[in-house]
């Protein structure tokens, strides 16, 4: 399709320089091309100064950024519409989030905004946008595959929670906080730096006492029910805060970061990718590199306090780990023919023999989907329509996923697919029974895969996502 006078000119910026992020933004750009709009996908995030200049040079009128809002200090050209596409749950401790939006902006989330933890009022349109699949993925089903396996799971698992008690470090932390409580002086930036210089070799910058971490862990294990897709990060985070009330006020608030920035030059742009390595370091080399890169010398602007970072981990990442540990243990009761792919699995000793590494290319991932009799999927908050789910279905792979009370909400499986027809559904109580039934019925698995692939082609290509965005921009 050719462009016309009303065609948009769109710039799409990933969250990270990673194969997955690059594949997603390129797929969306191709979707825009298919419906007649110019779109350019960047391979990596760029500085706000560069983004504003690129909009001018390329005559961009729409910017889509993954997991980013507008920069409040460096405005885009006035005619540019901004779209934030958040693909992660929202941190419980996120402050000032609404300040990054204009009335003309759009915020998309990967699923239902409320379920994912968005609890602030925004001045702009808020909607849901799923990932899509491209024609190359659909065509991949024509390739032959061999060496079938009963079960596979492709995805990240957080490492196990391992911490050792250290009375020495806990006492140092206690004295450090006594110093902080000195009236007026204790909260000064100068004393904050002095304390960190004095204790930095004996006490990590983000240290949280063993007793606090243990209370947080026990709270989550008591409250969270794995493999039900009902995670409420606010409920868990608030519970952690209440139970940890004994330590309230013991965790220092980091001094505000001065948001005034220097304009980038060639040297700062060259060094910026390396500056992240030196966050929190106060040696001469670290300070010098971050200064030359025009970054805050000691930390990032979005750095959370140690207490808030621990809350985010236990309210978001720890439930994800519990889900996958429970799921794989259930699988091993059915069959030892199992392959696990992705980062994190090697850190779980009980699963190391099943870990086959991390797949770096899409073709390898699609091959695993096709040769697995059952592709395992789980989610903590009802987001069934993950990119892996859609890509697996697109090549005819068979998916098993647990039910969720959010299955009928945006991003839920029941918004597009029917259990028993397009995929296999299970609960924590009947996984083994359901898995055995699907393993023994090859024809039913094959039929479900074919029907799911047809549904993906008709509703979940990148061109469908591009059309949705164009329609939403005209609201």
Please describe what each predicted stretch is.
Residues 107-124, 326:
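A short, active-site helix/loop in glycosyltransferases that binds the activated sugar's phosphate group
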Residues 10-17, 23-35, 39-44, 100-104, ...:
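Catalytic binding pocket for nucleotide-activated donors in carbohydrate/polymer assembly enzymes
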Residues 75-90, 106-109, 124-131, 152:
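Active-site proximal beta-strand in glycosyltransferases
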Residues 90-106, 193, 197-202:
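Membrane-proximal helix-turn-helix segments that form the acceptor-binding/catalytic region
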Residues 6, 14-20, 24, 122-382, ...:
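Nucleotide-sugar donor-binding catalytic core of glycosyltransferases
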Residues 1-79, 271-296, 307-314, 318-322, ...:
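N-terminal pre-catalytic "stem/leader" segment of glycosyltransferase-like enzymes
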């Amino acid at each position: 399709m050719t462009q016309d006078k009303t065609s948009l000119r769109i710039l799409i910026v990933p969250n990270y320089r990673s194969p997955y992020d690059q594949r997603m933004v390129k797929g969306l750009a191709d979707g825009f091309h298919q419906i007649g709009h110019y779109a350019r996908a960047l391979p990596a995030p760029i500085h706000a100064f560069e983004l504003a200049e690129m909009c001018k040079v390329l005559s961009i009128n729409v910017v889509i950024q993954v997991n980013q809002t507008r920069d409040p200090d460096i405005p885009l050209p006035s005619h540019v519409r901004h779209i934030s596409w958040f693909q992660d749950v929202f941190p419980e401790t996120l402050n000032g989030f609404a300040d990054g939006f204009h009335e003309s902006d759009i915020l998309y989330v990967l699923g239902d905004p409320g379920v994912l933890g968005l609890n602030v009022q925004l001045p702009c349109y808020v909607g849901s946008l799923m990932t899509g699949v491209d024609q190359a993925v659909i065509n991949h089903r024509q390739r032959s595959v061999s060496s079938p396996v009963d079960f596979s799971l492709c995805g990240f698992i957080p490492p196990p929670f391992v911490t050792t008690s250290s009375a020495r470090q806990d006492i140092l932390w206690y004295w450090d906080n006594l110093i902080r409580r000195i009236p007026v002086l204790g909260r000064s930036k100068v004393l904050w730096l002095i304390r960190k210089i004095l204790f930095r070799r004996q006490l990590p910058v983000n240290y949280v006492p063993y007793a606090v971490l243990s209370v947080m862990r026990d709270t989550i294990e008591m409250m969270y029910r794995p493999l039900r897709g009902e995670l409420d990060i606010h409920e868990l985070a608030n519970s952690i805060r209440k139970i940890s009330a004994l330590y309230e006020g013991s965790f220092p608030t980091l001094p505000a970061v001065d948001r005034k920035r220097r304009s980038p030059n060639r040297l700062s742009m060259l060094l910026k990718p390396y500056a992240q390595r030196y966050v929190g370091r106060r040696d001469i080399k670290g300070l010098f590199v971050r200064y030359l890169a025009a970054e805050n010398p000691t930390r990032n602007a979005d750095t959370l306090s140690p207490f808030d970072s621990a809350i985010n981990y236990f309210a978001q990442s720890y439930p994800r780990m519990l889900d996958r540990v429970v799921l794989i243990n259930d699988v091993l009761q059915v069959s030892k023919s199992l392959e696990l792919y992705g980062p994190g699995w090697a850190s779980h000793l009980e699963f190391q023999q099943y870990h086959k590494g991390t797949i770096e290319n899409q073709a390898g991932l699609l091959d695993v989907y096709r040769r697995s009799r059952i592709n395992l999927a789980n989610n903590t908050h009802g987001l069934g329509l993950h990119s892996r789910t859609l890509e697996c279905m697109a090549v005819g792979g068979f998916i098993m996923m647990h039910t969720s009370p959010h299955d009928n909400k945006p991003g839920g499986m029941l918004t597009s697919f029917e259990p028993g027809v397009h995929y296999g559904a299970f609960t924590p109580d009947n996984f083994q029974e359901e898995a055995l039934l699907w393993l023994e019925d090859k024809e039913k698995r094959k039929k479900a895969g074919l029907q799911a692939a047809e549904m993906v082609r008709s509703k979940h290509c990148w061109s469908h996502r591009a059309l949705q965005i164009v329609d939403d921009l005209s609201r």
